[in-house]
């Protein structure tokens, strides 16, 4: 069976579970379960600490896992990113107290930086020629400045609310942009059919989240103009109607552009425009 690691807690956990459920996989029913076998789908799910997933995958103990790109980079393991998953977007930023004179990357020189991602931060500073002390903390790094342990912090920022509440402000360019991703062991062949099935299923969920099905009627004389507005993946499905002067069109369109596309189609001459949500797909 394909061994898959998923976060047992944290901001990536629930979206990861939901995505796997939408892809047809069985999840745990008891929060104390650490392992779930799904023989019908040929997988075994392991619920692990988010920080540890890349380590297990990199060492080949687990075949694939869902984690953050920042966690993968910080792990320094041999695990390979296989595909982005479209959730858990964040940036990794430096932050200093509001009243601090630290406002640029150069100001970090000689300072103390508290972070949970010490390898990521150390490598970034070395790359930019900055010498600073990195202090590893397992969490709540915002308190380190107030307690006098550090001069600034480096941490994941989603909304910035936690930093603002702690009297901190971000500065300099982000160290990196991150989102959830599927990673694989270097021991797992990229062409492994089990991985191919998982990839198709997850991509199908992503497509269902990002696209909708649009149906509309259009005069035959306006079909070309309408298709130019909604070209679809390969090509729209065009069917004749009882009224020989009209065709029915069915096409997939980006969910984020639905209202603009409906307006554009109406201007072209389309009528009876209907949008339907997708549950799953294989493209």
Curated annotation (Swiss-Prot):
Broad class of where this protein is predominantly found: cytoplasm
Record-annotated disulphide pairs: none
Gene3D superfamilies, alphabetized: 3.30.70.120, Periplasmic binding protein-like II
GO molecular function annotation: ATP binding; ATP phosphoribosyltransferase activity; magnesium ion binding
One Pfam assignment: HisG
Catalytic activity: 1-(5-phospho-beta-D-ribosyl)-ATP + diphosphate = 5-phospho-alpha-D-ribose 1-diphosphate + ATP
This protein's pathway: Amino-acid biosynthesis; L-histidine biosynthesis; L-histidine from 5-phospho-alpha-D-ribose 1-diphosphate: step 1/9
GO CC entries: cytoplasm
Location of the protein in the cell: Cytoplasm
Enzyme Commission no: 2.4.2.17
GO BP terms, alphabetized: L-histidine biosynthetic process
EC category: transferase
Function comment: Catalyzes the condensation of ATP and 5-phosphoribose 1-diphosphate to form N'-(5'-phosphoribosyl)-ATP (PR-ATP). Has a crucial role in the pathway because the rate of histidine biosynthesis seems to be controlled primarily by regulation of HisG enzymatic activity.
Descriptive protein name: ATP phosphoribosyltransferase
Taxonomy of the source species: Bacteria, Bacillati, Actinomycetota, Actinomycetes, Bifidobacteriales
């Amino acid at each position: 069976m394909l061994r898959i690691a998923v976060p047992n807690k944290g901001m990536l956990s629930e979206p990861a579970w939901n995505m796997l459920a939408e892809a047809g996989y069985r999840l745990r029913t008891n929060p104390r379960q650490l392992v779930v076998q799904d023989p019908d789908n040929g997988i075994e799910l392991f619920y692990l600490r988010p920080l540890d997933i890349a380590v297990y995958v990199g060492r080949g103990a687990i075949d694939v896992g869902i984690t953050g790109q920042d966690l993968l980079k910080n792990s320094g393991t041999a695990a390979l990113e296989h595909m982005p998953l479209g959730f858990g977007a964040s940036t990794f930023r430096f932050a200093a107290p509001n009243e601090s004179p630290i406002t640029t990357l150069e100001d970090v020189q000689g300072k103390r930086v508290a972070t949970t991602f010490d390898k990521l931060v150390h490598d970034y500073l070395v790359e930019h020629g900055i010498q600073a002390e990195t202090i590893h903390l397992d969490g709540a790094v915002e308190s380190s400045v107030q307690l006098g342990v550090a001069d600034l912090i480096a941490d994941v920022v989603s909304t910035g609310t936690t930093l603002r509440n702690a009297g901190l402000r971000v500065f300099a360019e982000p160290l990196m942009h991150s989102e959830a991703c599927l990673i694989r062991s270097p021991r797992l062949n990229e062409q492994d059919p089990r991985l191919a099935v998982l990839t198709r299923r997850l991509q199908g969920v992503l497509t269902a989240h990002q696209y909708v099905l649009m149906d509309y009627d259009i005069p035959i004389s306006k079909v070309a103009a309408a298709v130019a507005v909604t070209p679809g993946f390969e090509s729209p499905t065009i069917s004749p109607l009882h009224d020989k002067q009209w065709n029915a069109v069915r096409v997939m369109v980006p969910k984020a552009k639905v209202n603009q596309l409906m307006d554009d189609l109406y201007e072209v001459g389309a009528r009876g425009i209907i949008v339907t949500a997708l549950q799953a797909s294989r493209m």
